[in-house]
């Protein structure tokens, strides 16, 4: 109910609104800002379908149900639980032509530092990563590892769909780390300008 009081401003820098639904994409959002992303996707991109990576923990169960209500499937896994299996399932979703959404610093952080899974997934699938940023005019902060944002009722939500980020193939650990940092920097640039 409270979500209906929010006002939105959308900045589609990645031209995702005009991207064919036959072209799969990876959406990446920081963990502390993901709460209303399912509603944003339902409202602004209702024709896109796919799956979201949700923590295999008990806390992830209610998020998985919310994601399913807006038309996305839930792939359960994380860096500490069923991580490899989850990445392979997400790659299958992309191979079938659907999108995936990931919080690359979740479920335990550290905040604003992406893990390796999204890089492996982008390399394996060839799908571009679209950074997504949600900024709230008024919010509460939860005392959690990532200081999770809860938008206050009647606040303004600025949604930025960043430009597509293509992750290059790598053959060394150093090159892989460079790709990880390049994507992390692209995501952080949206946070820093807000």
Model-based region annotation:
Residues 1-40, 154-156, 182-194:
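Membrane-anchoring hydrophobic helices of lipid-metabolizing enzymes
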Residues 23-81, 141:
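Catalytic core of membrane glycerolipid acyltransferases/transacylases, capturing the structured
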Residues 58, 80-83, 107-114:
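Acidic, metal-coordinating catalytic cores used for nucleic-acid/nucleotide bond scission
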Residues 77, 103, 131-134:
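Generic beta-sheet signal
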Residues 89-121, 125:
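Catalytic-site beta-strand/loop segments enriched in glycine and acidic/polar residues
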Residues 113-172:
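A cross-family acyltransferase "interaction/gating" segment
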Residues 163-167, 171-173, 177-192:
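C-terminal functional extensions of proteins
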């Amino acid at each position: 109910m409270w979500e209906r009081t929010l006002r939105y401003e959308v900045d589609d820098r990645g031209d995702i609104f005009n991207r064919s639904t036959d072209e799969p994409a990876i959406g990446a959002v920081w963990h502390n800002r993901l709460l209303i992303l399912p509603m944003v996707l339902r409202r602004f991109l209702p024709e896109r379908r796919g799956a979201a990576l949700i923590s295999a923990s008990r806390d992830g169960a209610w998020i998985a149900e919310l994601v399913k209500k807006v038309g996305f499937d839930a792939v359960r896994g994380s860096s500490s639980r069923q991580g490899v299996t989850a990445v392979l399932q997400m790659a299958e979703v992309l191979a079938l032509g659907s999108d995936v959404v990931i919080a690359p610093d979740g479920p335990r952080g550290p905040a604003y530092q992406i893990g390796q899974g999204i890089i492996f997934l982008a390399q394996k699938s060839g799908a571009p990563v679209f950074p997504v940023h949600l900024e709230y005019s008024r919010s509460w902060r939860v005392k959690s590892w990532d200081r999770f944002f809860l938008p206050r009722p009647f606040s303004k939500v600025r949604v930025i769909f960043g430009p597509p980020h293509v992750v290059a193939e790598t053959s060394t650990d150093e090159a892989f780390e460079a790709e990880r940092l390049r994507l992390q920097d692209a995501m952080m640039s949206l946070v820093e300008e807000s």
